[in-house]
Amino acid sequence: MGEPVLPKVEPDLVGIWKKNVWWFGLRWPFSTVLFSWVTVAATLAPEFHIYRYLLTMLAGFFGLVIGAHYIDITASKDKYLPYFPKMNRGAIRAAGVLAVLAGMAVGVYMSFLYSLWFLVFVILGGFFALFYPIEKPKWLHTYPGFGLAWGFMPVLASYYIQATRIDLLGLGLAVFLGITVVEMHHMAVLTNEKEYSGDMTKNARLLLKIHRAAAYTIGLILLLSRLI
């Protein structure tokens, strides 16, 4: 007899993503959407500097993609342990914390290079990456907190560092994408096969695919518009 099939509690617990906890922890389907929205913000800023954009992506990769997600896996051990029973929680947590610190280090470098005001984004981003996954304070691990930590702040930071100023366009974009990532998060919640019916989870996965396709397409087109 084969191993029992576990119900999917996350939309990316499929295929190669569920083969290894370190690989799953990067949460690529969601992380690439985040990078797409960060790209949209950078390319719509009054100025566009490729080196600043690449540094922004590097800081986000360390802090939010590796750091926050690895910490989240260890903080949610009861949720993920059935899928990765041999995972080394201590090693994953340590890697997550170190990655957040690495992301903050890149952010500090950017601050001294371009604008000391960017340190505000670095400090807040580090705080969100470290404490959102462990649900402290409680208000942070809510839909508004998610929108702030994974949408509004990264988008506004990406917009600001390009021209070192914030205008109404940048603020409006950050608010819009902050709400958009909450919609994405709720669709991901609705894919939990332990909590919802097959029709519900199927439709939620379809909407997530459409959402990802839109994010990738918009981000790529706007990036090309700045590079060509």
Short names for language-model regions:
Residues 23-39, 52-118, 198-222:
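Multi-pass membrane catalytic core of lipid/isoprenoid biosynthesis enzymes
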Residues 54-62, 117-127, 168-180:
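Hydrophobic core segments of alpha-helical transmembrane domains in multi-pass membrane proteins
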Residues 68-83, 127-140, 186-194:
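C-terminal ends of transmembrane helices
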Residues 41-54, 228:
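Short, hydrophobic transmembrane alpha-helix segments
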Residues 37, 103-106, 153-169, 216-228:
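Hydrophobic alpha-helical transmembrane segments in multi-pass integral membrane proteins
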Residues 1-23:
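Short, Lys/Arg-rich, polar N-terminal cytosolic tail immediately upstream
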Residues 89-162:
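Intramembrane alpha-helical segments
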Residues 47, 147-191:
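Functional transmembrane core segments of multi-pass inner-membrane proteins
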